A protein has these predicted regions:
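Short, hydrophobic/glycine-enriched beta-strand segments
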Residues: 1-7
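A solvent-exposed, charged loop/short amphipathic helix patch at secondary-structure junctions
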Residues: 7-35
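Short beta-strand/loop segment that forms part of the nucleotide-sugar
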Residues: 57-66
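Short catalytic/ligand-binding loop motif for oxyanion handling, primarily in non-cytosolic enzymes
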Residues: 8-12, 67-72, 95-96, 131-135, ...
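Long, charge-rich alpha-helical interaction segments
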Residues: 148-242
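Short, acidic, metal-binding catalytic loop of nucleotide-sugar glycosyltransferases
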Residues: 48-56
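Active-site-proximal specificity loops/subdomain of glycosyltransferases
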Residues: 26-33, 37, 69-119
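GT-A fold catalytic core of metal-dependent nucleotide-sugar glycosyltransferases
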Residues: 67-68, 112-155
Length: 242
């Protein structure tokens, strides 16, 4: 599963600005245009999967009424796999949660990937700027029917939390600007650890393909619908999310 967006699309930009006050757009880090840039990385991402992980059954590209138009390049190198590439609109995975659309928040989108129709129980989540560079086996991602976690146990990100707190204090007290704290993948993962009772350490995953279990995600969010809704309500990425 690959999450993708083309930030240069004028329709998407217009939609995004609708949810931003003209005075807010520079104060919300999650609305920074650089978060939505596309340099055609999606083509290389897809081709790398087809070449180096041919055992992958399907590739789902999740997007908001957009199309990366990669059929021709896939047809050129892997003509037999064109039908295995499927575009999934946000409306499909947010069915029943349409009030939270549109969203411009990759965390919210990732929370809903398990709702893709025809998705295998074992699936791998890619960002469009992540590529495979050599042949791999399924065991790289799953062993004994369980996801392989890639990362390391870390102490809580105290340094980042303290620095962010000081910066926020300086901006609001000295500069008089209420600028939101910049969302951090360390802090967002720490927030997830806190939800599960971890107080003194957390497991930090890097910017890498993530092996996931659809049933576990479904079970968790079914048992904790309010936590899901709390995460989904932020149209732009936020510091407090998990």
């Amino acid at each position: 599963v690959i999450a993708w967006v083309d930030g240069s699309d004028p329709e998407l930009s217009k939609k995004r600005m609708k949810y931003l006050d003209s005075n807010e757009k520079d104060l919300i880090p999650g609305a920074n245009p650089t978060r939505f840039h596309s340099l055609n990385e999606i083509s290389y991402c897809v081709l790398s999967i087809l070449k180096f992980a041919p055992f992958v059954r399907k590739i789902f590209i999740v997007t908001d009424k957009q199309n990366p138009n990669i059929d021709n390049v896939v047809k050129q190198y892997f003509p037999e796999r064109v039908s295995d590439i499927q575009i999934v609109d946000h409306l499909e995975i947010f069915e029943g949660y349409e009030d939270y659309l549109p969203t411009f928040n990759s965390i919210c989108i990732s929370n809903m990937l398990w709702r893709i129709k025809d998705l295998s129980n074992q699936f791998v989540y890619f960002n469009d700027d992540v590529f495979l560079v050599k042949h791999i086996k399924p065991s790289v991602w799953f062993q004994n029917n369980r996801p392989v976690l890639r990362g390391k146990w870390m102490l809580p990100p105290y340094e980042r939390l303290i620095w962010d707190g000081l910066k926020s204090f300086f901006q609001s007290t000295i500069l008089g600007k209420q600028i939101e704290r910049v969302s951090s993948f360390q802090v967002n993962q720490w927030n997830a650890a806190l939800l599960h009772g971890f107080k003194f350490r957390y497991f930090l995953s890097g910017h890498t393909p993530l092996a996931l279990d659809k049933k576990r995600l479904k079970d968790y969010f079914t048992l904790h619908p309010e936590k899901l809704k709390e995460n989904l309500k932020h149209r732009f990425r936020k510091y407090t999310q998990f």
